[in-house]
Swiss-Prot record:
<comment type="similarity">
    <text>Belongs to the Xni family.</text>
</comment>
<keyword id="KW-0238">DNA-binding</keyword>
<dbReference type="Pfam" id="PF02739">
    <property type="entry name" value="5_3_exonuc_N"/>
</dbReference>
<feature type="binding site">
    <location>
        <position position="185"/>
    </location>
    <ligand>
        <name>K(+)</name>
    </ligand>
</feature>
<dbReference type="InterPro" id="IPR020046">
    <property type="entry name" value="5-3_exonucl_a-hlix_arch_N"/>
</dbReference>
<feature type="binding site">
    <location>
        <position position="109"/>
    </location>
    <ligand>
        <name>Mg(2+)</name>
    </ligand>
</feature>
<dbReference type="InterPro" id="IPR029060">
    <property type="entry name" value="PIN-like_dom_sf"/>
</dbReference>
<dbReference type="GO" id="GO:0030955">
    <property type="term" value="F:potassium ion binding"/>
</dbReference>
<dbReference type="GO" id="GO:0000287">
    <property type="term" value="F:magnesium ion binding"/>
</dbReference>
<feature type="binding site">
    <location>
        <position position="176"/>
    </location>
    <ligand>
        <name>K(+)</name>
    </ligand>
</feature>
<dbReference type="GO" id="GO:0017108">
    <property type="term" value="F:5'-flap endonuclease activity"/>
</dbReference>
<keyword id="KW-0479">Metal-binding</keyword>
<dbReference type="GO" id="GO:0033567">
    <property type="term" value="P:DNA replication, Okazaki fragment processing"/>
</dbReference>
<dbReference type="InterPro" id="IPR022895">
    <property type="entry name" value="Xni"/>
</dbReference>
<dbReference type="InterPro" id="IPR008918">
    <property type="entry name" value="HhH2"/>
</dbReference>
<dbReference type="InterPro" id="IPR020045">
    <property type="entry name" value="DNA_polI_H3TH"/>
</dbReference>
<feature type="binding site">
    <location>
        <position position="190"/>
    </location>
    <ligand>
        <name>K(+)</name>
    </ligand>
</feature>
Length: 260
């Protein structure tokens, strides 16, 4: 039997649904709305296996903040009513047949990346449901990303139009430009246009840095800020080697569970 694993970036979905609710304390409405959303996802995707991956709301900013102290320093905290409602949300999702994986020390992004690439590398189909373009570096013939809210696929044509580079170059791209929303600085003076020019000529940051053909205006910037570029690339790259502690059989989709 062919496999189709759907991985839901849980808080990415929940926080968007919750922020659109007229009453932020009405978690019951958030549960109902996310439930309808999940029903549509299940209907459209027809998964054989499915899991929702959550960041732990109490954890720190993980290993990335250890090497880049400002990483996500300014991110908005989760609303208190939503924090208190997470257990109820996870229970409601479980009743729909979707189990939850809660990160402990690792960012949810890395857990998603590890599971997705592990399954996709065996030629099985994987769909990540998220608006987070960071996952696009994982794109492969068997791994796709679905932006549910914009009703679009974050695929190679989208990446080409949005960034002008290949999916495999995205970590290098962000190493150069930085990621302002996560307080990742990149290389001062290198914006999207410059990063695209560099990565059109060279495969990655190291190839550009090592080449005598790099144009002088970019040579000066990389000479002065190569360590920042390397560090920011490392932060932008997703880890795909985390010990998950479960196997596919544990997340087979068999339909709704009985309420406990």
């Amino acid at each position: 039997m062919s496999i189709h694993l759907v991985i839901i970036d849980a808080l990415n979905l929940i926080r968007r649904v919750h922020s659109a609710q007229p009453d932020p304390t009405d978690i019951a409405r958030t549960i109902t709305t996310t439930g309808r959303t999940l029903t549509r996802i299940l209907s459209e995707a027809q998964p054989t296996h499915i899991i929702a991956v959550f960041d732990h709301h109490e954890q720190d900013r993980g290993w990335r903040a250890e090497i880049l102290p400002d990483y996500k320093q300014n991110r908005k905290p989760m609303p208190e009513p939503l924090i208190k409602g997470l257990d109820a949300l996870q229970q409601a999702w479980w009743e729909q047949g979707i189990d939850s994986l809660l990160s402990e020390g690792d960012e949810a992004d890395d857990l998603v990346a590890t599971l997705a690439t592990k399954v996709a590398s065996h030629g099985e189909k994987v769909t990540i449901v998220s608006t987070d373009k960071g996952y696009c570096q994982l794109l492969s013939p068997t791994l796709q990303i679905r932006d549910y809210f914009q009703h679009r696929w974050l695929d190679e044509p989208f990446i080409e139009k949005e960034f002008g580079v290949k999916p495999s170059q995205l970590a290098d791209y962000w190493g150069l430009t930085g990621i302002s929303s996560s307080q990742v600085p990149g290389v001062p003076g290198v914006g999207p246009k410059a990063a695209k020019e560099i990565l059109t000529q060279f495969e990655d940051i190291e190839a550009a840095y090592a080449s005598e053909e790099l144009v002088p205006k970019y040579r000066k910037k990389l000479d002065e800020h190569i360590e920042s570029a390397r560090l920011c690339k490392r932060v932008a790259a997703l880890k795909c080697d985390i010990d998950l502690g479960f196997n596919l059989q544990d997340i087979r989709f068999t339909g709704p569970n009985k309420a406990q």
